[in-house]
């Protein structure tokens, strides 16, 4: 095997490992990172009542749209970051829109599971809280 092939394989493995580590760090921080062409991770798993931060690293202003029940939705402008708390278990889809209409809309989902400790979420909001604003279904 040539040295170039070995270096190429090693570089590929290193890049793959780096991407996996970045995804693990984001999940450990309860963060979803908005990049120019993708969400990291696109499917985020959390627990009901946990705070999830959406971090904008795209270099552009974006709007995060939380898709609600029966077509209801709310959109929030994000220059740096926003946070949300999901008060109901289940799938919570969202979209990220860029200010440039030529940019592709990014789609993701937050999966909120019931708290296994059984402590529950002592909330007053039935669905979703974004930056201290209750979004009702």
Which residue stretches match the model-derived regions?
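Bacterial Sec-dependent signal peptides at the C-terminal "C-region" and cleavage site
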Residues: 17-27
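Beta-strand cores of secreted/periplasmic/IMS beta-sandwich domains, seen most often
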Residues: 42-63, 81-88, 92-93
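N-terminal edge beta-strand
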Residues: 25-49
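Non-cytosolic beta-sheet module surface loops
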Residues: 36, 55-58, 98
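Positively charged n-region of N-terminal signal peptides that target proteins for export
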Residues: 1-5
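Bacterial N-terminal signal peptides
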Residues: 8-18
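Extracellular/periplasmic metallocenter environments
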Residues: 77-137
């Amino acid at each position: 095997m040539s040295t170039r092939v070995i270096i190429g394989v090693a570089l590929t493995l290193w890049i793959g490992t780096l991407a996996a580590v970045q995804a693990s760090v984001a999940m450990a921080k309860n963060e979803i990172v908005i990049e120019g062409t993708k969400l990291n991770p696109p499917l985020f798993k959390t627990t009901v009542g946990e705070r999830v931060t959406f971090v904008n690293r795209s270099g552009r202003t974006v709007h995060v749209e939380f898709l609600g029940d029966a077509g209801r939705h709310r959109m929030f402008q994000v220059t740096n970051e926003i946070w949300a708390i999901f008060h109901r278990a289940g799938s919570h889809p969202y979209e990220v829109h860029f200010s440039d209409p030529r940019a592709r809309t990014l789609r993701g989902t937050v999966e909120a599971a019931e708290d296994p400790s059984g402590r529950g979420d002592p909330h007053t909001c039935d669905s979703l809280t974004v930056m201290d604003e209750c979004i009702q279904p």
